[in-house]
């Protein structure tokens, strides 16, 4: 972290009904903060996702993030746009939404707990019907520490699929 920029590395592992445990993608993202007021912040994200599923191309992802927070609670909402790239790319830009409601320092005054959810509505040019959309919701634990003037954060979570198109279980 700096006062306005951070980078993250995420690993997405899922368990769909008809497949074994699957390493879905590895995501490298950068965040640039637009503003940070006392209880409200916004940022832009850019990420490149290395997709390991055979039938899909890698992804370029853009996000706009809003965060409302105080000393005890927070709510983060992301508006996400993804476009597949590479030789296996297909389709137009997709629209996703994610929400994360968290309670700060709930466990041992050092681990945050939150309810987290992701919704994939489909391509911007044609949203899918609800049963064909991907919706996963669950919980997440996270914490952080500082080492040699650098902030490090970790998070782990579980998501449960709500539609047939969603992975049944995902660890994030």
Task: Indicate residue ranges for each PLM-predicted region.
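Transmembrane beta-barrel domains of Gram-negative outer membranes and organellar outer membranes
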Residues: 1-171
């Amino acid at each position: 972290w700096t006062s306005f920029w951070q980078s993250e590395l995420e690993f997405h592992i899922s368990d769909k009904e008809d497949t074994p445990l699957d390493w879905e993608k590895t995501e490298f993202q950068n965040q640039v903060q637009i503003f940070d007021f006392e209880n409200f912040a916004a940022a832009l994200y850019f990420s490149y996702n290395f997709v390991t599923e055979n039938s899909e191309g890698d992804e370029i992802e853009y996000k706009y993030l809003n965060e409302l927070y105080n000393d005890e609670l927070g709510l983060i909402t992301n508006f996400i746009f993804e476009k597949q790239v590479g030789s296996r790319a297909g389709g137009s830009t997709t629209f996703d939404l994610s929400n994360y409601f968290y309670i700060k320092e709930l466990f041992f005054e050092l681990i945050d707990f939150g309810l987290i959810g992701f919704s994939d509505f489909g391509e911007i040019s044609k949203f899918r019907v609800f049963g064909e959309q991907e919706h996963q919701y669950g919980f997440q634990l996270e914490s952080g520490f500082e080492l040699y003037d650098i902030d490090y954060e970790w998070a782990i979570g579980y998501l449960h699929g709500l539609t047939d198109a969603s992975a049944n279980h995902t660890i994030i």
